[in-house]
């Protein structure tokens, strides 16, 4: 209704003797239509409120092996949020972790695989089985780094992967349910957020933050 009024007022400007009144009416009509146009794109816009660096967060997750992990349990946490299609990015982050973090109980990497769809119960089982197989493959790759550094530890026990079907994990990062964003965050032992990126950080960037956290 307000749109029709503005439109009618705008057309009637030619019959208004005061140029200032006509200008105001046109400006209000333009503002209204611009607002309506922007509103159409808001659902697809980047609406999440990112976590604040320097703030403390106690975020809790359960990985695919049933391990309960937290960002404030006394370990430095490198957390990666990734969509299933971007798992190579998660691998790239892992490959850039400094060697002194490998097998070190003071450090931990958690990967959250976020699914935007709603798979069926059977679909979840298949996805979980596939994810476990890929995690085991990644463990073999990581084991080669352990062996090269003479770290006598099973690399598989140091891989923590959370399969987020319902958005309960990603929502703790203020991530919208249908978002497929990629994020990397580093938390100190007490859960203080030290750094965050929306792309794969360089090895130098990771090393700098992880060194400061120690």
Regions inferred by a protein language model and the residue ranges of each:
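Bacterial N-terminal signal peptides
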Residues: 31-43
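Thiol/disulfide oxidoreductase modules built on the thioredoxin-like
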Residues: 73, 155-158, 164-202
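Bacterial N-terminal signal peptides that target proteins for export
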Residues: 16-34
